[in-house]
């Protein structure tokens, strides 16, 4: 990883991005079982794979905190998937974001993934593209309203 000394700072900035996504994806429909499922998966991954292998105190706090926001973003995106094609693509983007960040954690703390950088960056960029489509839909709706 390039600039690993700045990993925690980067995590803070990505947490801010997750807050923005959560705000954009709203809390309707609620669909709590999606949130519970994501929470269980992230909790198991953190407690079994990541946290036992991290010694840095900041990261021991940062990973769970960031995971709460990442999981909430995924929940909110997946909860809207039945609203249309753009929402389905946005949900897929959220899943890819979870995969990308999951690979970062696994690669850092549990197992050095072969071709990790390629996997992480390709899933991240595709996730961003798919999530961005939801903003394009909002812009299109605004144009129609005017």
What are these regions (language model features)?
Residues 1-146:
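Polytopic alpha-helical membrane-helix bundles and their juxtamembrane interface segments
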């Amino acid at each position: 990883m390039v600039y690993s000394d700045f990993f925690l700072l980067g995590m803070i900035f990505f947490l801010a991005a997750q807050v923005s996504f959560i705000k954009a994806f709203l809390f309707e429909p609620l669909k709590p079982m999606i949130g519970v499922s994501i929470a269980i998966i992230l909790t198991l991954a953190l407690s079994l794979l990541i946290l036992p292998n991290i010694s840095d105190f900041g990261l021991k706090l940062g990973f769970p905190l960031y995971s709460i926001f990442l999981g909430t973003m995924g929940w909110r995106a997946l909860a809207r998937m039945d609203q249309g094609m753009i929402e389905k693509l946005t949900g897929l983007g959220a899943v890819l974001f979870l995969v990308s960040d999951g690979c970062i954690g696994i690669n850092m703390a549990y197992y050095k993934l072969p071709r990790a950088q390629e996997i992480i960056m390709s899933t991240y960029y595709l996730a961003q593209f798919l999530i961005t489509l939801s903003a394009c839909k909002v812009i299109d709706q605004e144009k129609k309203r005017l």
